Design a protein with these regions (language model features):
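Nucleotidyltransferase catalytic core that binds NTPs
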Residues: 1-155
Length: 155
């Protein structure tokens, strides 16, 4: 099961650990667009679509988790910063089973969605930072242009 955080703008709240994550620039895609990207990328990587589920996950609202995911599941995390530690504390506050895959510094994380969005906003090359199938969909949906429009509005 893969959780998509910030699935609905009404479920997004500002987080002290990462104030940017609740911005429009950080969330330019709809839940369904992110669902399609994840599913397409996983299938492209050879994962059978019947082997996974993708669900909305209002990560900043632990009281809602039970409506979206089985609480007896193991919650896997990768931690790169204070926000990752905050997510872990949300899970632990409910007594959920948590498994940290790895914890490395933000600098060692590698490419991030923020990096890709920033490249798009600046009109720089980004396609080599995502799977081919994802690049096709992002271009088809006009996401670079959407991000540039958001940037102009926020400037």
């Amino acid at each position: 099961m893969i959780g998509i955080t910030n699935p609905d703008p009404s479920l997004v709240k500002e987080e002290q650990a990462d104030r940017h994550r609740s911005s429009v620039q950080a969330n330019p895609l709809t839940y369904f667009e992110r669902y399609r990207l994840l599913r397409t990328a996983l299938v492209e990587a050879g994962v059978d679509w019947t082997d996974f589920s993708i669900v909305p996950m209002p990560i900043s609202m632990p009281g809602l988790y039970r409506h979206y995911v089985p609480l007896d599941a193991v919650f896997f995390l990768s931690i790169y910063d204070e926000w990752g530690r905050r997510k872990k504390s949300y899970f632990e506050s409910l007594g959920l089973k948590v498994h940290v895959l790895w914890e490395v510094s933000h600098e060692r994380k590698g490419i991030s969605g923020s990096d890709v969005r920033l490249r798009m906003m600046r009109g720089k090359s980004w396609e080599n930072a995502v799977p081919i199938s994802v690049a096709v969909l992002l271009r088809e949906w006009g996401i670079p242009e959407r991000l540039q429009k958001i940037k102009r509005k926020e400037s």
